[in-house]
From Swiss-Prot:
InterPro entries, A to Z: Ribosomal_bL17 (IPR000456), Ribosomal_bL17_CS (IPR047859), Ribosomal_bL17_sf (IPR036373)
Domain of life per record: Bacteria
A cellular component annotation (GO) from this entry: cytosolic large ribosomal subunit
Gene Ontology biological process terms from the UniProt entry: translation
UniProt KW keywords: Ribonucleoprotein, Ribosomal protein
HAMAP family for the chain: Ribosomal_bL17
Record-given protein name: Large ribosomal subunit protein bL17
NCBIfam families: L17
Amino acid sequence: MRHKHGYRKLGRTSSHRKALLKNLAIALIEHNKIETGIYKAKELRSYIEKLTTVARVGDFNAHRHVFAYLQNKEATHKLVTEIAPKYAQRNGGYTRIQRTTFRRGDASTLATIEFV
């Protein structure tokens, strides 16, 4: 049973799940808004908000910490220098999730996740 389990498995192995969240986070940073499944969006929210909180500091160590998760120089630079400073006075709640529609093939709920 999954009682009080800390995260969703998303039907993937741990390495696949880690790669999925990393790629979704990079896409969100590059485009500021993406559409994905509702449960992926909810997991991504936790992942990206932790990174944004670290990136708000804006120093060298923040760059290193964010890069360790994203492994993408452009996305790291954009998060630390452009996106995170906008939230300097905000304690969490950097993203918004809105349910949009149902996927035509399997009728799963889709949602958009975007920076506020």
